[in-house]
């Protein structure tokens, strides 16, 4: 259990890409990493928030990753 003596926690973070228009500045592509690096508020019980909408069968999607659709 994370937080118990001798335990380790691993966090894998995959950020969505962002395209810059006209010019790329040092602040582009950092929105997700800035949010992930901010501390959680005191009393936060669950540091992970799942805000993804699950796949629905039969709904067309924009398929960007060249791999088979999960079944």
Curated annotation (Swiss-Prot):
Its main location: secreted. The keyword Zinc applies. The active site is at residue 18. Expressed by the venom gland. It is found in: Secreted. Its EC number is 2.3.2.5. Transmembrane segments: none annotated. InterPro entries: QC/QCL. GO terms for cellular component: extracellular region. Disulfide bonds: none annotated. The keyword Secreted applies. Keywords: Acyltransferase, Metal-binding, Secreted, Transferase, Zinc. GO terms for molecular function: glutaminyl-peptide cyclotransferase activity; zinc ion binding. It catalyses: N-terminal L-glutaminyl-[peptide] = N-terminal 5-oxo-L-prolyl-[peptide] + NH4(+). One of its GO terms (biological process) is peptidyl-pyroglutamic acid biosynthetic process, using glutaminyl-peptide cyclotransferase. Zn(2+) binds at residue 19. Responsible for the biosynthesis of pyroglutamyl peptides. Has a bias against acidic and tryptophan residues adjacent to the N-terminal glutaminyl residue and a lack of importance of chain length after the second residue. Also catalyzes N-terminal pyroglutamate formation. Belongs to the glutaminyl-peptide cyclotransferase family. This is Glutaminyl-peptide cyclotransferase. It comes from Crotalus atrox.
